[in-house]
Amino acid sequence: IKISENPAKVTTPHFKKVYRLFSNTDGKAFADLITVHDEVVDENKPLELFDPDATWKRNVFTDFTAKELLVPIFQGGKLVYKQPSMEEIRAYCKEQIDLQWDEVKRFENPHNYYVDLSQKLWDLKQELLKKQR
């Protein structure tokens, strides 16, 4: 773990998964969630998210879809990734931008887009920080 006086610069070590969370009501992305690699987000259960820098700020979400964002490039030393064309990359980027709320995309006073840690990953990070004191 890299420790810094600036909390934003403290690393979050571990093998991780990243999920993008979408509201089933309107299809918009409302947060990204970083988990330990062996965690699974159960879309059938309420999901509590919290701000890793202000842990008292918590919200419970239901009726959502979680999409895993990271894709394997190599497995067992073999390349398993087919690189998309520039047009496919452009289309994907446009699609992801369109899935954001207008309030997040605006230039003046944009709303924050939340990237949260799972409770398990946050606990592991805190444990490592305590060991370094």
Q: Which residues does each predicted region cover?
A:
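Gly/Ser/Thr/Ala-enriched C-terminal appendages of enzymes
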Residues: 1-133
